[in-house]
């Protein structure tokens, strides 16, 4: 078995407030789940903001995209999916049944 580098999100600790979405009547989430989702959302918004603020060719910024030097052969056939679309489809399928 070969080991390959693991990509990870690096969070710089900045926190901003974000609007809370109204709860859906069919979905009940624990406070811990909501906090995890909020943390990931805020962290990703910070990453996107930092990426937009970086000057191409300038000095190294806060955010750096990780790219493997040697691609993992197991991922050769990997096709990215839109998670929002997947959730939408699974929700529609659940309502049909």
UniProtKB/Swiss-Prot annotation:
> Where does the record place the modification N6-acetyllysine?
79
Segment Disordered: which positions? Answer: 1-30
Per the record, the domain of life is: Eukaryota
Residues bearing the modification Phosphothreonine: 30
One Pfam entry for this protein is FAM195
Q: Which GO terms describe its biological process?
A: regulation of epithelial to mesenchymal transition
Residues with Phosphotyrosine modification: 41
- Give residues where Phosphoserine occurs: 21, 24
As for family, the record states: Belongs to the MCRIP family.
Task: State how it assembles.
Answer: Interacts (unphosphorylated form, via the PXDLS motif) with CTBP1, competitively inhibiting CTBP-ZEB1 interaction. Interacts with CTBP2. Interacts with MCRIP2. Interacts with DDX6.
Q: What functional role does this protein have?
A: The phosphorylation status of MCRIP1 functions as a molecular switch to regulate epithelial-mesenchymal transition. Unphosphorylated MCRIP1 binds to and inhibits the transcriptional corepressor CTBP(s). When phosphorylated by MAPK/ERK, MCRIP1 releases CTBP(s) resulting in transcriptional silencing of the E-cadherin gene and induction of epithelial-mesenchymal transition.
Q: What is this protein called?
A: Mapk-regulated corepressor-interacting protein 1
This chain's source organism reads Homo sapiens (Human)
